[in-house]
Amino acid sequence: MPSVRKQAAVIPYRIRNEHVEVALVTTSRGKGWIVPKGWVDDGERPRDAAIREAEEEAGLRGVVARKPLGRYHVKGHGRRSVDVYVMRVTKIRDHWLEDKFRRRRWMRIPDAAACLRAELQQFIHHLEGELES
């Protein structure tokens, strides 16, 4: 049985005008909106990978939950397990490592969920429920 490769994703959020907003970035080819996500390097903890991806792909820093919000699995192009973390954004950079080929956009929960694949929509809605309760 082939091994499962690990990835980490992060849902960066802020509260603005009493509404939860989530930061999405374009894919590396600019063909859609995603949350920052990437491979967990050898010897790296998934949480640390999530922090790194938020900075590299979106230019965001903040407070990341110690435990993932959840996990989903991807079967295409090799089996992958993706741990999904939540980050309360405290710093937004104007320029970041991948800003030449990625755009960043803040969206309210319903708009962000509509842009994302089904496996991530559940996490976005769960985040909304947690923050508004």
Kindly give the residue locations of the regions a language model identified.
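Conserved Nudix-box catalytic region and its N-terminal flanking loop in Nudix hydrolases
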Residues: 18-61
